[in-house]
Amino acid sequence: MKAIEYPKLLASAIAVLKRQGVISYPTEGVWGLGCDPMSEVAVRRVLRLKNRSISKGLILIGSSHQQFARLLEDLDDQSKRRFIEKRSKPTTWLVPSNDTIPPWITGNHDSVAVRITKHPVAKGLCEVFGRPIVSTSCNPQGAPPATSQSQVQEYFGDKLDYFVMGEVERLSLIHI
């Protein structure tokens, strides 16, 4: 696992995502494990690393509401406005899923958790990647989420393809 610093080598992390790799990076809440949500191979690898059931579903993060435009098409105008409205804190939304979200992301749910990230590293990853990425807590099932780079190493060692350096922040959850 190579360490990278934002934004100098961000393109290398994106190349890993495009090759169906798995990366670790800081988010608003804890360290995240991420991959391309359209790659079933990459998503299943994340789930294996975490020993997590596919039935639970995964969260997606994006750099802006535009990255979720196709998902928002079926929402009523008021719900769209609430989602698009600027918030002081990063907020996780549970949005009804549609055919743009693969079943390995939604699990046994008819909704998907999405967040517009404000974290500079996570936002940069989504911007350069050009679409949302998977963002699940960086921990094996039953262990507390990693809150430091050393904890990420302790949990996963060299099992990750890339490690993006940085610091974590905090977030909120709203159900629509």
Say what each PLM segment does.
Residues 1-174:
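Active-site-adjacent structural elements in enzyme catalytic cores
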